[in-house]
Regions:
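Repeated loop/turn-to-beta-strand initiation elements of outer-membrane beta-barrel proteins
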Residues: 20-23, 76-79, 132-136, 194-198, ...
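Aromatic- and glycine-enriched pocket-lining scaffold segments that form the walls
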Residues: 3-88
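Residues that define the transmembrane beta-barrel architecture of outer-membrane proteins
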Residues: 6-10, 62-66, 118-122, 129, ...
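Solvent-exposed loop segments that connect transmembrane elements
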Residues: 41-51, 91-114, 147-175, 209-243, ...
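Residues on the lipid-exposed face of transmembrane beta-strands in outer-membrane beta-barrel proteins
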Residues: 12-16, 68-72, 81, 124-128, ...
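Outer-membrane beta-barrel "beta-signal"
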Residues: 327-343
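C-terminal structural cap/anchor segments
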Residues: 178-286, 290
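Transmembrane beta-strands of outer-membrane beta-barrel pores
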Residues: 18-20, 27-33, 74, 85-89, ...
């Protein structure tokens, strides 16, 4: 966030093996969050709004996260079951408080409050190896809820000039409760001329959504979304806080990758694309595309140079207009190069 430069991670894991079975446990005494871009001029991707630390509702209870999984090895692959209980990696809009100076409401401020939903995940996965082909798949059910209730909102002080805006007049916690699922299917095979092909299909959808409303009368700014109050249906701006990062962009996507190595794997070329195929409310079969071309050259055993170009294309005719995620990201198209040295 804007006031923080680093976020620690502490976790532990235990794996137990018995014949063709594997049982694993994970535990973390702290909440591990996703690395969102900071407001740095040299970083090409930025959020339109940068929440400050005091705009977040702190997790009042102990933010313990834990999970376990079990897998069985088969003759041509494996199957697994996973469970996780913790907090979302991405923050969400938790609600809004309206403050003023004493009883005078003529100069009030809207305090947008963010938080992290409590999430439980139950998933299954499999890997199958058939000849030169590999099939991978996973599906997961997510139950997530915003644990910030009315009492927590009433206890909050204004995040902006609390000595002046010292009186809370209105409080609107969203209290989201959502059930959703995610599914990923992946196919890998070696094509002629030693070209590695990877194809992936991703989809997610909400199964059930409940929340309170936000009866506001002026426009507000929310990270990743500029929206008017008339359009501010909390269900419309719901974004999964856990699972595949593709879920932030679209509900349905196809990913294709081709990779070729030459000169004894010293030089590698990779062409990949992400296609938004969520076209239920749009005539264009592929509203947006992210295309990436990368090459990597190993100068010696320790030194590697990478060069890449990414082009992001949205659709000006998309029903969401400028709010369509890939339209927002078009300016993030970029050329990059980096030098890696391994000790």
């Amino acid at each position: 966030f804007s006031e923080m430069e680093a976020t620690p991670e502490i976790s532990s894991a235990l794996d137990i093996y018995a014949n063709n079975y594997k049982l694993g446990f994970t535990f973390s005494p702290i909440h591990n969050t996703h690395r969102t871009p900071l407001e740095k001029d040299d970083f090409p991707i930025k959020l339109p709004t940068y929440p400050y630390e005091n705009e977040f509702m702190k997790i009042s209870s102990s933010p313990v996260e834990y999970g376990f999984y079990g897998s069985k090895t088969l003759s041509k692959g494996d199957i697994s079951v996973h469970y996780f209980n913790g907090y979302d990696r991405l923050f969400n809009l938790s609600g809004v408080n309206v403050y003023a100076n004493g009883p005078d409401k003529s100069f009030s401020i809207i305090d947008i409050i963010y938080g992290y939903r409590k999430t439980k995940i139950l998933g299954v996965g499999t890997n199958l190896f058939i000849g030169d082909a590999t099939f991978r798949g996973d599906a997961a059910f997510f139950n997530t809820s915003d644990v910030n209730d009315e009492d927590k909102f009433l206890e909050r002080k204004s995040s902006y000039l609390p000595t002046i805006y010292d009186s809370l007049h209105y409080s609107y916690p969203l209290k989201e409760e959502v059930n959703y699922f995610q599914t990923t299917l992946q196919f890998e095979i070696e094509l002629p001329f030693d070209i590695q092909f990877t194809g992936q299909f991703f989809t997610y959808d909400t199964l059930d959504y409940k929340s309170d409303s936000l009866p506001l009368d002026e426009d507000i700014s929310i990270p990743n979304l500029e929206i008017t109050v008339d359009e501010l249906n909390p269900e419309n701006i719901f974004t999964p806080g856990y699972g595949s990062s593709i879920g932030i962009l679209t509900k349905k996507a196809a990913v294709i990758s081709l990779q070729k190595s030459i000169l004894d794997d010293q030089l590698t070329f990779k062409l990949s694309s992400l296609l938004d195929i969520d076209n239920n409310s749009h005539d264009n079969s592929i509203p947006g595309i992210i295309l990436s071309l990368e090459t990597s050259y190993r100068l010696n055993n320790n030194l590697i140079i990478d060069i890449g170009y990414t082009k992001i294309t949205g659709d000006s005719n998309h029903p969401l207009g400028e709010d369509y995620r890939l339209n927002i990201m078009e300016d993030f198209s970029h050329f990059r190069t980096n030098l890696k040295y391994n000790f």
